[in-house]
């Protein structure tokens, strides 16, 4: 989600912008990913647009785009990480898209997903459309960020944060049900 899109949300809902990271003073660049949002703030934005945060399974399906590979291309071509980011986020869509035409699925910012984190969940979950744990202490983020080593920019990597956490490495994208 971009700063520009989030500003529209804030303007129409009387909300407030998140804390400004030092590399985007005043949220001047609308094409940067929105960061410093909590899980609840991300969820509220998605609901406002008629969507929701994707489940972890949906996110992984989207990033893989029909592939079983760990990445959808060479790491320098697909994502921003600690070795090429210059210590900050970058405008969305600057790196190569995946097979579904989605940009920034790996790198730039971690993305909140709907699921609670359970380190062992996938060992016991159904293989088709797992619903995710019903409770937990942290919410899942996926995709890696501009501060991580390149080996973390892989389709299966997952991490967790408390839902109230926010930071210059955490953003989100929304999902919608598409009726054919």
List where the protein language model places each region.
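Active-site microenvironments of metalloenzymes and redox enzymes
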Residues: 1-74, 114-122, 176-180
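Surface-exposed recognition segments
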Residues: 27, 67-68, 85-88, 105-180
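Cysteine-rich, disulfide-stabilized extracellular repeat modules
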Residues: 30, 49, 74-77, 88-91, ...
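Active-site rim elements
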Residues: 30-33, 92, 97, 158-164
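A short, contiguous structural element within a folded domain that forms the immediate neighborhood
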Residues: 77-102
